[in-house]
């Protein structure tokens, strides 16, 4: 219990809660820094809004909101409930170039060439049995008003549900690829970054392998990203950083499940040799790290050894330290 209370206090201190802001654009930190953004607080206004509506307002994915607010009803969160909006994050450990997709955190990072900024978008990715692969590739084609040609496997899966798909779904409002698509050069070009015609599925595992964005996000990205842009897709459920001031942070997301029986809240997370060294360092608080690995809040947690942690009310600490399993959706769309 003591380590849980210390972890909860550290989480609230390190998240930098501030007044609401809605931009997904962040100034690029120095090369030796990876911490960006500030978390926000928002209050559920009534009993008529789903968590997806609130998440979309702040440009957050649904599972990201659930990680940050365990136990919240995703369909009808209770009016007056105070929610943390997870807008603080650590940049992935990759080159700051082009597009970087981190599957585990269900986010896409875009580094515009020659600009000192990074733009972050929530995404939907491949479901169980149709996972989005890890890769390094590039944008090979930009397609406005795309048609959708379902693969034979996709048509078979739909047929099992009693849905007969046409060979080609024409462009328009009924097309699940939305109004914009960018084809990836990998393999035969079956993977795309595209929009959606649905009002759900962002920040979830719902696609047939493609990377999906909300309509306004894919339009902005489509209009900004040139053909040939580098795209790196990674799977890093744990990110960590030592900032220029010496402070140490760890950000833990629920890992991607491998089957229907996996619980992303409790399934093991593989730790790299470098991460193990980070954890064992005398400059790191191993108890705070252990709590962060269990909590999997999806937010950076300050884990420096010897950091002063202010006291908070026991009920606040208990709520912040609560661990709750959140499943991953398997709705099937492109």
Where are these regions (language model features)?
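Bacterial N-terminal signal peptides that target proteins for export
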Residues: 1-8
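Bacterial N-terminal signal peptides
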Residues: 8-18
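Sec/Tat signal peptide C-region and signal peptidase I cleavage site
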Residues: 19-25
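Primarily a LysM-type cell-wall glycan-binding module
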Residues: 26-59
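LysM (lysin motif) carbohydrate-binding repeats in extracellular/periplasmic proteins that recognize
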Residues: 46-76, 117-119
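Loop/turn positions that initiate beta-strands
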Residues: 78-83, 228-231
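Gly/Pro-biased beta-strand-loop elements
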Residues: 89-197, 223, 252-333
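N-terminal targeting pre-sequences for secretion and organelle import
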Residues: 222-265
């Amino acid at each position: 219990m003591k380590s849980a209370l210390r972890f909860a206090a550290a989480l609230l201190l390190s998240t930098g809660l501030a007044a609401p802001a809605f931009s997904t654009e962040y100034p690029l930190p120095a090369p030796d820094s990876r911490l960006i953004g500030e978390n926000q607080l928002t209050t559920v206004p009534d009993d008529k809004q789903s968590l997806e509506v609130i998440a979309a307002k702040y440009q957050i994915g649904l599972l990201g909101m659930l990680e940050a607010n365990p136990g919240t009803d995703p369909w009808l969160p209770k009016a007056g409930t105070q929610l943390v909006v997870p807008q603080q994050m650590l940049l992935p450990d990759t080159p700051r170039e082009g597009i970087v997709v981190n599957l585990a955190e269900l986010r896409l990072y875009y580094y515009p060439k020659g600009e000192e900024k990074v733009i972050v978008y929530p995404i939907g990715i491949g479901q169980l049995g149709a996972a989005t692969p890890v890769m390094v590739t590039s944008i090979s084609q930009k397609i406005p008003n795309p048609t959708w040609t379902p693969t034979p496997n996709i048509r078979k899966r739909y047929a099992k549900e009693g849905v007969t798909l046409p060979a080609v779904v024409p462009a328009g409002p009924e097309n699940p690829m939305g109004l914009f698509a960018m084809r990836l050069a990998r393999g035969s070009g079956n993977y795309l970054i595209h929009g959606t015609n649905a009002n759900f599925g962002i920040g979830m595992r719902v696609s047939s392998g493609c990377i999906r964005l909300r309509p306004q996000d894919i339009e902005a990205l489509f209009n900004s990203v040139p053909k040939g842009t580098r795209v790196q897709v990674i799977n890093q459920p744990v990110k960590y950083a030592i900032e220029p001031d010496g402070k140490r942070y760890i950000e833990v997301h629920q890992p991607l499940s491998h089957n229907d029986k996996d619980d992303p809240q409790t399934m093991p997370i593989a730790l790299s040799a470098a991460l193990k060294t980070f954890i064992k360092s005398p400059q790191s608080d191993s108890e705070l790290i252990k709590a962060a690995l269990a909590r999997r809040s999806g937010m950076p947690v300050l884990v420096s050894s010897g950091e002063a942690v202010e006291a908070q009310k026991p009920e606040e600490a208990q709520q912040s330290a609560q661990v709750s399993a959140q499943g991953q959706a398997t709705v099937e769309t492109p």
